[in-house]
């Protein structure tokens, strides 16, 4: 009888000990990283790989008392110890075992090509690729009315207004997209809409056909980045030049040089920039060597810049666009006496009065549907929108 009680006691003690060990291990897993992290933090990768600002520590005040719990949770989630280390480990496992990305906005394609397949209201690259977001007749009418209104008002101010649409990378290099991502229909949203808008006499131009002509001969987009490279942007710049000035420079007239290895923003989003760095950075050389362009003004983040040149064309160009407009800075300033670049984060109508451009280029990449559709609001706004985050 006593032996049974002793055995039962030993079993209970063993079970209790096991529970204590598990609880202790769990508590240690929560506490130890926080305790150890300050000592090793300087030796770890702390870079922000997300396309947003990380949450800041909440304001500890009576006025902000109700918001402190949720703001602290957001702060802790963004700054949790060893976050990049754990994210990188999970990403590697997902890529090696499943050939999938742990980041929903990044699709891993064939030969490790990375694609930005964001799927949000106003910016739905996945729907663009799958062709599931075609415009309705009413939407196309509203879009045509908005572009017509902007164009007419620009003409009244003596400005030539043109809109260019740069294709998403997967629209040019669809052969590298995974077969599991199905495509429905024969035309994308812009494949269907842009010819109709152009047929109405509206100054809307599709850059995809010109890029597709060279896509098999040259690599026009970065492998691990969502943007076109210098070769792709050169082709885009010459389409703009041909449209506005009636002249352009063919690829055969410039030199294309490999300037070293390249990674990209999509690799950084996966926290795999070091592993995905075998792409090539191409540089265009000997473009209009007889013209010299210099930077006369540029803000800290390069979202606003002014160039002057000794071009025989004494006109002023204003380029307003998303991140795809950035690489045009290598080429467009040589075509005008003055060229002003402003991203959508810096542009306001006041720039029209300040610089009085002769030509106005409004450039968006295919996925930036909202900025394409809201052209009338964007062009005439009097203040810069606040950034998220």
Task: Say what each PLM segment does.
Residues 2-389:
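Extracellular glycan-modifying ectodomains
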